């Protein structure tokens, strides 16, 4: 396979992932019309976990974690990355638009290095990193207070920000633990455990049960879209891209997702997004760019070379004038 073909396939997978995860917020909005948030999230990961578990079996993966360390990883991940994260996400999205929800959640890649700095001895956060975290927080505050809202939208933004915190903290904690189970079985068990916890939390929060849900073809379609495509298939695409293009470039999908979410919410749900929300997104994106400036530099340079913005300078190339100046004098 040629490099060009591989690049085009990677771009197609990246775009597919951005579209799936971006439109997931629209599907959540549809489901929340009739489903309580924790129960909705539980049903999503009942199905997603089962699909991914079957995929792991067909792919000849080890079907379950082995030993205490691997089960601890599954327990922490299921609690923080699935249970807490999606309970907060679905609850928060009741109060805000799809675009706002996606933008607030895009603070996760900014918060993750902050937790890593405090919990992982090899991680360091310099002054630029702290400024990046600050910009991300400023962006979140701008969005929370946009349109003069200090009621429902503020509550929604706070819940969504806590969802981002849960994801970032859980990611670092899982990385810190010694267990290293196979990826697909680990994720499927995390999803199933998280779904079980959400089923427990739902009645504790006073949510009505399944018998009260006014099911419709649209709601069923939204649930299956979220579970099968956004969660199970999206997870597989994510790890394929992670292996092919690396962590920095795949993290950029976090900033394509809010654009897709805002556009899909506007096109299909009639949602509007104000200038203050756009400004908040710019703050968050700037914070991420500042934190990852060194890692992003080779990617940006390569992108500029591929698009012809800058010319590729090969080792040994010299400016003609400098070559003339440095040439030895005639004897």
Task: For the regions a language model picked out, list residue spans one by one.
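Transmembrane alpha-helices of multi-pass small-molecule transport proteins
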Residues: 32-84, 109-115, 166-170, 187-207, ...
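Helix-helix packing/entry segments at the starts of transmembrane helices
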Residues: 43, 101-107, 172-196, 227-267
């Amino acid at each position: 396979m040629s490099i060009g073909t591989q690049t085009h396939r990677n771009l197609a997978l990246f775009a597919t992932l951005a579209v799936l995860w971006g439109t997931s917020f629209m599907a959540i909005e549809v489901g929340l019309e009739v489903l309580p948030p924790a129960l909705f999230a539980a049903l999503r990961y009942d199905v997603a976990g089962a699909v991914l578990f079957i995929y792991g079996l067909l792919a000849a993966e080890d079907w379950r974690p082995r030993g205490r360390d691997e089960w601890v990883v599954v327990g922490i991940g299921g609690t923080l990355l699935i249970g807490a994260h999606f309970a907060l996400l679905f609850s928060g999205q009741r109060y805000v638009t799809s675009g706002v929800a996606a933008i607030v959640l895009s603070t996760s890649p900014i918060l993750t290095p902050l937790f890593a700095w405090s919990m992982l001895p090899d991680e360091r956060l310099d002054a630029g990193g702290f400024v990046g975290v600050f910009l991300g927080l400023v962006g979140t505050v701008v969005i929370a207070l946009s349109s003069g809202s200090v009621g429902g939208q503020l509550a929604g933004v706070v819940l969504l920000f806590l969802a981002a915190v849960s994801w970032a903290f859980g990611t670092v904690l899982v990385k810190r633990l010694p267990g290293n189970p196979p990826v697909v079985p680990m994720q499927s068990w995390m999803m199933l455990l998280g779904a079980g916890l959400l089923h427990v939390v739902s009645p504790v929060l006073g949510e009505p049960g399944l018998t009260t849900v006014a099911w419709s073809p649209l709601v069923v379609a939204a649930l299956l879209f979220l579970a099968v495509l956004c969660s199970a298939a999206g997870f597989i695409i994510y790890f394929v891209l992670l292996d092919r293009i690396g962590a920095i470039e795949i993290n950029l999908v976090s900033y394509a997702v809010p654009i897709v979410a805002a556009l899909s919410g506007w096109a299909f749900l009639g949602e509007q997004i104000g200038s203050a929300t756009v400004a908040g997104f710019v703050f968050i994106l700037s914070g991420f760019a500042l934190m990852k400036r060194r890692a992003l530099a080779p990617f940006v340079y390569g992108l500029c070379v591929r698009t012809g913005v800058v010319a590729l300078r090969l080792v040994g190339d010299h400016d003609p004038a400098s070559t003339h100046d440095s040439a030895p004098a005639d004897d």
